[in-house]
Amino acid sequence: MQEDATIAAIHDQNSAGLDVITDGEQGRFDFNLSFYGYLQGIDLEAAPPRRFGPPAHDQRGKHPITEELTAPKGLGCVDEFKRLQALAPEGPALKTSIPGPFTLSGRLQPNAQYPDRYAITEALLPLVRKEIEDLVAAGCTEICVDEPSMSCYAYREDLKRFVDIFNRTIEPAINRARLDMHMCFGNFKGRSVGKKLIRVMFPDFLELQVDEMHIEMTTTAFRDLEVIEQVSKKMDAAVGIIDVKSYYVESPEEIADRVRACLQFAPADRLVFAPDCGLSQTARWAAKQKLANMVEGVNIVRKEKGL
């Protein structure tokens, strides 16, 4: 079933004309919640803390830690990448995503051994780092580390500490694969959870040792778009120009206008365009049309600029 779903996800991405594709994370039921099944040293939560009422982040519970955190069989990303390699057609580049340790730590309950979220993060860091190292060894040439918790709580946390955590996590892959960081403000059940403050992340996040920084922009109405000028001087700026939380399907012309706005702050060779976040909470029909329109809109501007 997972293979069939992956084939469908690949087909949809290719049909839209994407330059880089993934497996659609079809082996996961969430971008990060599935990973707790690979951990030893925790008790999986028996039931969500809230079942009824509107869907939201408080329906995700936390798993108690019972002993040292380990992942003796890895975190599953390598097998997912190998399946993508086997199923993908020639042409588009392949990318794999993995949640970072700070984001993963958010669903685990502190205990005497790991008294706070940062202690849990430090325990998870080598597990994620090992998975990244194994992905590179398996031939993965682009890895996106998802750290939405860092962007959600950047306004109140020590950003230099975030940068140190992130850079130590990706260290085995620096200069060995293209490294991306994804930042957003939450998308569980299509709901945001962060304060949506982008400027507070800079200039500290410019010290992240990545090739591409992906930032949710559409849901903030592009109010902080000028930050991509700073970003593009250090790395590629991947701008979220599709709202994955809305069922309004942006037209190619609207996308083209957003691309033109980005070009006021960053050169074309430093810009990447993507949805704000993953499309796991978006119906397939809407996701397909949004992706197709995104590509068409970008191509309108490419043609205008002779790119």
Where is each model-derived feature located?
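Domain-level signal for soluble alpha/beta catalytic cores
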Residues: 1-307
